[in-house]
Amino acid sequence: MYQKEYERWLSQDLADADLTPELLRIQGNDEEIKDRFAVSLAFGTAGLRGVLGAGTNRMNIYVVRQATQGLANWVKTQGGNQTVAVSYDSRIKSDVFAKEAAAVLAANGIKVRIYDALMPVPALSFATRYYNCNAGVMVTASHNPAKYNGYKAYGPDGCQMTDDAAAIVYAEIQKTDIFTGVKYISFAEGVEQGLIKFVGDDCKDAFYAAIEDRQVRPGLAKTAGLKLVYSPLNGSGLVPVMRVLKDIGVTDVTIVPEQEYPNGYFTTCSYPNPEIYAALELGLNLAKETDADLMLATDPDADRVGIAMKCPDGSYELVTGNEVGVLLLDYICAGRIEKGTMPANPVVVKSIVSTPLADAVAKHYGVELRSVLTGFKWIGDQIAGLEAAGEVDRFIFGFEESYGYLAGPYVRDKDAVIASMLICEMAAYYRSIGSSIKQRLEEIYKEYGRYLNKVDSFEFPGLTGMDKMASIMQGLRDNPPKEFGGYAVTKVTDYKKPEETGLPSANVLIYTLEGGATVVVRPSGTEPKIKTYFTTLGKDLAEAQAQKDKLAESLKPVLS
């Protein structure tokens, strides 16, 4: 079956000149042909993601066209404006895939609003809402290595597509022949027919205004003298982040030169992920050279941001996603109360795998904190619920431990642009009162306890990877562990049982241990890996770290 599909591809006059030579190179290599053609990339709520190359199990123009035809079939049943917003990041062929998607939509009579240059996830979410679109498409593979690309699909609210809608689109994709079942005109024809238009300056300006309206202490950054090092990690963050920082008065910014401009090969780091040290290393070195107060790095699609803070002894320390989430929550709450801008009955939303320290901080400020499943769409879902009740202004902040933050309802996905603005404003504020981010973080730990949150990952590559992951998760359910690292399990929460959790079904297990530590086990939604999340609480960092190490060691044989 897969051999036949391979031969069909080989017989085509393929429009992408890279694909035929690639197919010829694997001739006779059964394992390689099977990997590329035995299955197709699956379309889920996060859309598509895969390695670039020829085949149904790879990202290429034909897979993008087929996916877009499936999306178009769904859009045509939705009424409304019959419009889709499209954007893309700096990855290899992102601009090509975005134009291919626009061309297929136009061939189906659907209007398109596409950015004329790369713009990040939050800008796509905003444009989807601004133009009252039926859907949005963002061409990106987020922080994956350079060989990957992807295709994120958004619903009319600017939130990642719902499970139900994604299932319909996937069914339509499966019914569509990858070569003969797709309607197609050229991008130029779509423009000529008036079906494809570029996103206007009015939309871009409204996006920046919506972000800048969420300053906690407007004008403060202009006079604080904050010194910043910033890296867009060769992605799409450069223009929007620098625009907003300049607008709020953060002007002493040094950009990491090797990572300034878009480059989908990500030559300075193999994994452009602001969670890891290697991606931030150049920025950290530059921060030390320039004696910066703060270093920021946004990922390629600028929906996540990592930071390093200057410590009193002049060294720099990476701040985790959980710590930044708690710092921003604390800063937003304290600042809004001080300025009289806190709404009545404010709501904060975090994922179930994010730190319980946020619960303690929210309680201190009298803020309702809601915990939702992993994936920012669930935070967007909470905002949508508030909006439906006419209470959208109650939402003040949402975050995930994986470095994603949002501080307003203007978009429905994580936004590294507003996060960068608020982190800089927060740093400027603490600088202006003779404090620092580091000092405030230590004060928070002193007040609430020394929480430690760590994430480990176990990778399962290849065609059998997903089966191995499923087998491990089933094994944990069939034979529940009674202890980890000598700590007895006091409670198991299985999120596949919505009747017990009150949340939609999800493949997540949470183990509560004696003493209050927790271990979370869940397969990644976008990569072939199982993630383990540890939360430990000690009298100091060393005690919390020692417990985490014990727990992690005990899990290795279970997940190997």
What are these model-predicted stretches?
Residues 154-184, 322-345, 350-361, 416:
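Glycine-rich phosphate-binding loop plus the immediately following alpha-helix
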Residues 95-100, 125-129, 147-153, 174, ...:
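Short acidic, glycine/serine/threonine-rich loops at helix termini
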Residues 288, 292-294, 315-317, 335-522, ...:
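Phosphate-binding and adjacent anionic-ligand microenvironments
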Residues 37-57, 141-142, 228, 232-244, ...:
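Conserved phosphate/anionic-ligand binding catalytic regions in large, soluble enzymes, centered on
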Residues 4-101, 108, 190-191, 196-224, ...:
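An N-terminal, well-structured beta->alpha segment
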Residues 85-148, 246-306:
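N-terminal small/polar loop signature for handling phosphorylated ligands or for N-terminal nucleophile
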Residues 32-37, 41, 149-279, 286-287:
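Gly/Ser/Thr-enriched, mixed-charge loops and adjacent short helices
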